[in-house]
From Swiss-Prot:
Keyword Secreted included in the entry's annotation: yes
Protein localization: Secreted
PTM summary: Contains 4 disulfide bonds.
InterPro entries in alphabetical order: Spider_toxin_CSTX_knottin (IPR019553)
Domain of life of the organism encoding this protein: Eukaryota
A GO MF label: toxin activity
Signal sequence coordinates: 1-22
Pfam families cross-referenced by the UniProt entry: Toxin_35
Predominant location category: secreted
UniProt entry keywords in alphabetical sequence: Disulfide bond, Secreted, Signal, Toxin
Tissue: Expressed by the venom gland.
Name listed for the protein in its UniProt record: U7-lycotoxin-Ls1a
Family recorded in the similarity comment: Belongs to the neurotoxin 19 (CSTX) family. 07 (U7-Lctx) subfamily.
């Protein structure tokens, strides 16, 4: 009986450690991912750049994306 309990606990611990390790490996956000709530989550050589959105002069919030560091987008002149 003790062997079954010990084996079950060891298996649970192993599965938990594997799950935590898998989460840590894929922790960074790739290029083009939304980073509005996680500004520091972009992968290396990427930065989280934010833009305020407006519709008909009314602010509709802020949107952020992971883009290459130093890259800037600008509004096209109409």
């Amino acid at each position: 009986m003790k062997l079954i309990i010990f084996t079950g606990l060891a298996l649970l611990l192993t599965v938990s450690l594997i799950d935590v390790e898998a989460q840590n490996e894929g922790a960074c956000l790739p290029r083009g991912s939304v980073c509005t709530t996680n500004h520091a989550g972009c992968c290396s050589k990427l930065s989280c750049d934010c833009y305020r959105r407006f519709e008909k002069g009314v602010e509709k919030g802020q949107k952020c994306w992971c883009i290459p560091t130093g890259l800037r987008y600008s509004k096209e002149k109409e």
